[in-house]
């Protein structure tokens, strides 16, 4: 039962765009972890600029105000290869769905 916490900057994601992000995350979880469609738990946080702080760049990656910080909690025991595949799948799907740079996706498992 994964729990996804999606953090975005207030005003950057309207209802339609956040729905695309949400759907992309759930699709990646279903595809990579094989979670059932009805295993769906997400919390979405829109934070004001003074509460959503990040560096403009780090280790060759550049971040815009479209950055999404995603925390996913699930029961341990999945192999490293599966976790890495999940990171890649989420990044690819969310970047395409939201129209953001792949750099603008920070994921913590």
Q: Which functions belong to the PLM regions below?
A:
Residues 1-109:
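Interaction-mediating elements
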């Amino acid at each position: 039962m994964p729990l996804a916490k999606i953090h975005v900057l207030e005003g950057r994601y309207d209802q339609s765009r956040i729905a695309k992000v949400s759907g992309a995350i759930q699709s990646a979880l279903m595809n990579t972890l094989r979670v059932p469609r009805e295993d769906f738990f997400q919390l979405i946080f829109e934070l004001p600029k003074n509460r959503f702080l990040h560096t403009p760049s780090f280790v060759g990656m550049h971040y815009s105000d479209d950055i999404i910080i995603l925390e996913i909690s699930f029961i341990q025991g999945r192999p490293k290869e599966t976790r890495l595949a999940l990171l890649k799948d989420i990044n690819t799907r969310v970047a395409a769905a939201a129209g953001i740079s792949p750099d603008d996706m920070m994921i913590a498992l």
